[in-house]
Amino acid sequence: MARGEDSRRFKFVDETGLHLAFARRYGRAPGGQRVGQGVPLRVGTPVTLIGALTVNGLEAVMSLDGALNAASFAVYLEQVLGPTLVPGDVVVLDNLPVHKVAGMAQLVEARGARLLFLPPYSPDFAPIEQDWSKRKTALRTAQARTREALEQALNQALA
């Protein structure tokens, strides 16, 4: 965080991928037995979840089918994150190439906010990474195997 900045103004934006084959990574079994769990091989279309973490929690969340690209990130900035920005906000992004496409900075700066990029290879500086990890654990526990079940589990994980 920049010295002298108000931490309440920071919005850490990041994306994460989801699919229909999420399963718990660890389990328990009686002594001498192995844990077994079936996981589907076909996971369907991946789902990308993008959101902004503030001191008040996760906000401005959007899900989309497939991977994040410049066009979908521009839609997120204009229609989802943009309306939540007020002059003086600081939008913190990692160094994903999609975040650095020409015109993205102008979408944020037009709202009176400013962009701040994390140093390369520094996910530890973005608290949203840990937030996504906790929420994805809840999704693994839910083991949604249909898109509808994933949406329902996602709503519970984001609540």
Regions from the language model: what does each represent?
Residues 1-159:
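Short functional hotspots at interaction and active-site rims
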